[in-house]
Amino acid sequence: MKGLVIKNTGSWYQVKTDDGQLVECKIKGNFRLKGIRSTNPVAVGDRVQIILNQEGTAFISEIEDRKNYIIRRSSNLSKQSHILAANLDQCMLVVTVNYPETSTTFIDRFLASAEAYRVPVKILFNKVDAYDEDELHYLDSLITLYTQIGYPCFKISALTGEGVDAIREELKGRVTLFSGHSGVGKSTLINALVPGLEVKTAEISAYHNKGMHTTTFSEMFPVPGDGYIIDTPGIKGFGTFDMEEEEIGHYFPEIFKTSANCKYGNCTHRQEPGCAVRKAVEEHYISESRYTSYLSMLEDKEEGKYRAAY
């Protein structure tokens, strides 16, 4: 029997079978995906084969080939990865310039990982109703930056409804992963997009100005227009996984394009003479924040924080 994984609670997976049944499934202890050492070998969005047992539950026996997936390192020094979701048409990264602040480093690491696994990303700048003049000016500068690179950007307020209709249109006929820090308003936005869903939300911690985790597991919801949303737990940091040092620049489109003009084919864009990328940063054709994010990923790689999957 075949089906779609629509919910993952850690030890159990909820599968919607092709004939419409909802079946609670487990995986066998030795289940591994070839080439991936992951804390969750099965992810929401996976197409699977299941074997029913007498209790009405089932085992997942096989995963169909994935179109793509989004993966992050489980923790800073971990050799294992965590797959956020699989078989995506797009990601929507929900960010805020305050309450709490989403750093450009976090944004860039997420974008680089999505580039590596061929998942298009749209950036949703939420809480535009809450910002002062300086914050709105900074937000506009970020929108200019990421739009020029090629990432569609949207200004929204999940609270007031500003921009929500435009996002609703973008969901039609697509499987969309929603991701971002805790507290950026992801669950509030999903509730605004799909009335009646009532995904649990929480207030921002006033003491730390950080969000509190409300979604504790990944889950897929249908949306009007034959689309699906995958809601994931808020994440503090985004450790990219399974990237070789020489590949990292490939996942920054503007750095990759400019690197064709570097003197050396294996230029890492740090100290090498004749580096077109460094020159472009100095002349403000490449954003300094993007270049800083690129360097931080190289530095982490050198410190051994990025490990090849096996």
Swiss-Prot record:
Known EC number: 3.6.1.-
InterPro entries in the cross-refs: G_CP_dom (IPR030378), NA-bd_OB-fold (IPR012340), P-loop_NTPase (IPR027417), Ribosome_biogen_GTPase_RsgA (IPR004881), RsgA_GTPase_dom (IPR010914), RsgA_N (IPR031944)
MF (Gene Ontology): GTP binding; GTPase activity; metal ion binding; rRNA binding
Gene Ontology cellular component annotations, sorted alphabetically: cytoplasm
Keywords: Cytoplasm, GTP-binding, Hydrolase, Metal-binding, Nucleotide-binding, Ribosome biogenesis, RNA-binding, rRNA-binding, Zinc
PROSITE patterns: ENGC_GTPASE, G_CP
Enzyme kind, highest EC tier: hydrolase
Domain CP-type G: start-end pairs: 77-238
HAMAP family attached to this UniProt entry: GTPase_RsgA
Assembly behavior: Monomer. Associates with 30S ribosomal subunit, binds 16S rRNA.
Protein's name according to its UniProt entry: Small ribosomal subunit biogenesis GTPase RsgA
Organism of this sequence: Bacteroides fragilis (strain ATCC 25285 / DSM 2151 / CCUG 4856 / JCM 11019 / LMG 10263 / NCTC 9343 / Onslow / VPI 2553 / EN-2)
Recorded name of the encoding gene: rsgA
